[in-house]
């Protein structure tokens, strides 16, 4: 299977099957052999997301490696990027997945475990994957990171914030981005231009490097923010 380009499939970065380039750092991705769905995602922690048309519209749930539906297709589509099915994939991470569904106050995000049980209530306008015990969420237009108990660990004064990868998370403000550590401290300054249409998740670290772009040309940085050779 070809490597998945992080630049074009940012939501997949919660999975293990990622690649910094089209040939380097790739890993095997597996999908369950199941039919009857408009989309079948890659297995992560033994589960894969599926999307199915219902009278209420496209809904998502999860199947196991044998293709058995273990979490019903009751959640809203995770299509936060565009209409291509490959962008519908929220990964289970640290035993939970961020999903969204219609609530009386509108569409809200929460977290479920691998049995489908709600473990963090649907209170958020946005919710990202857990990593390093933290997940980025937006509530009442404020960005923050929460723990597995749903408690706020720290807030961040940025326009957007991503999940952690190798101890760092991308944060963006006014079209530029940098990186914070797990204490919320900005350790790589807000200085890089955010390409139009790209998710900030596409700039996360893998194997000690992050692939960025300047004037359409790629370059890489290490976790200290220094420019290094790309693989």
Per-range role (PLM):
Residues 25-231:
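Residue-level detector of conserved, function-critical positions
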Residues 1-11:
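Bacterial N-terminal signal peptides that target proteins for export
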Residues 10-19:
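Bacterial N-terminal signal peptides
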